[in-house]
Amino acid sequence: MLENPRSPRVRAVAKLTKRSARTETGLFLLEGPQSVREALTYRPEAIVELFATPGGWERHPDIRAKAADADVRVEYVTEDVLHAMADTVTPQGLVSVVRQTPTSVRDIFDAAPRLVAICEEVRDPGNLGTIIRAADAAGADAVVLTGRTVDPYNPKVVRATTGSLFHLPVSVGGELPDVIDRAHAAGLRILAADVKGDDLLAARAEGVLAEPTAWLFGNEARGLEDDALELADRVLRLPIFGRAESLNLATAASVCLYESAFAQRAAPAG
């Protein structure tokens, strides 16, 4: 059992809360039973280390079974050690070190996707995590991150995805013009979400949302820059029926992705 919260090994795990350490090692940190469960289910080969308090391990027999099936060995730690490793105040008894497995932009669009979320300059970890989770729930084929979008392996992003990070391909570090070119070459229409756009309801009525689509979402404060908007085939806005000034980015992105998911599933086949 690991008992010293100041040991070099514990410090190495704790450093993964910092982007520099994640970039250097190609690893990231998972905390809590839900994230660990999804990693064991969908990417067990990416798990490098799994740590648990005895009580945390005992509380989750399904995780114990998945770890055994995947031949992933758990190392017991004290509560003090777990807190020293984790980014959260209450890591719920489980922490894992996992290998990053980003997908290339080329591979994403070579797979002939029908629904993709492109995030340009999205900076808030909670927003990005929620967009990844919403894309997963809506049946999107991938999420592509461009510009200075926050690191998807940031602990706050990882927590906000609640495991969806392991369910669909995520591409990191692409340049927007190249991503748009590849999306067009794959037959996708680029729809940009922006308050300056046309009403989304009109696009729905025209059948636009039933087509293979890459939604483009911008920065929380500034939205999409003019040069990014010019790359889109169409710019759409969500109508506001009540008195709210606007929706936050993650909520708006969720609505847009689900609108496309509904339309694509309602469209006649072939």
Residue ranges of predicted features:
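Short pre-catalytic strand/loop immediately N-terminal to key active-site residues, enriched for Gly-Thr
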Residues: 26, 119-123, 237-245
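RNA substrate-binding interface of SAM-dependent RNA methyltransferases
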Residues: 69, 80, 98-197
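Glycine/charged-rich beta-loop-alpha catalytic/anionic-binding loops adjacent to active sites
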Residues: 19-20, 109-117, 231-240
